[in-house]
Regions:
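Nucleotide and nucleotide-moiety/phosphate-recognizing core
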Residues: 2-112, 123, 127, 133-137, ...
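Catalytic tyrosine of NAD(P)H-dependent dehydrogenase/reductases that use a Tyr as the general acid/base
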Residues: 115
């Protein structure tokens, strides 16, 4: 007699952003935008999961759980910790997707681990998991002329300009391709 056991190796893809329509299409919500784009392409449905303080979508084909924490950007670690505990996963099983105003607009940088580099969402995950040993994908949102005029806080909450908005689908497609290969 044979017993077959399926080992479930799920990855959790966490897109950073702030809940609420007033933050739609802001630089800080690029993680949410990336997951929304991916979910649309793969015909996934979002579900509210209050126990995770998040909205999630499952991609069974690729063994992924997409997560948009509803805690606000700087407290994303609360949701991540709850999800990892629930599914009995490790920090290395997540992929954090966040904006980075120090990277050229649309540039994508992947790291297996590392410091938060000033990103409060990454700091929150590091604090709640007790490690910075988790993968992250930083997406460039740099616009130095605008940032120098309005400051960092207002910059990350600013909307994309027309030229950036036009390039956005290409950037989101590239992120989606990365997620599938990840």
């Amino acid at each position: 007699m044979f017993i077959y056991v399926k080992i479930y190796l799920m990855k959790v893809i966490v897109g950073f952003g702030n809940p609420g329509s007033k933050y739609n299409f802001t630089r800080h919500n690029l993680g949410f935008l990336a997951l929304d784009f991916y979910a649309k392409i793969h015909q996934l449905n979002w579900q509210n999961k209050p126990k995770f303080n998040a909205i999630v979508a499952k991609d069974d084909e690729h063994d992924l759980l997409l997560v948009k924490a509803q805690t606000y950007y700087n407290e994303v670690g609360l949701s991540v910790r709850t999800i990892l505990d629930f599914y009995k996963l490790k920090a290395q099983d997540i992929l954090a997707i966040c904006d980075d105003f120090n990277l050229e607009f649309g540039k994508i940088r992947f790291r297996e681990r590392g410091s938060a580099g000033g990103n409060n969402g990454l700091k929150s995950i590091t604090t709640h998991l007790g490690t910075d040993d988790f993968p992250r994908l930083r997406i460039g949102t740099a616009n130095d002329s605008l940032r120098s005029k309005i400051g960092d806080t207002d910059f990350v909450l600013s909307r994309f300009n027309d030229a950036e908005y036009e390039k956005l689908p290409e950037v989101l497609r590239e992120i989606g391709d990365f997620i599938v290969k990840y």
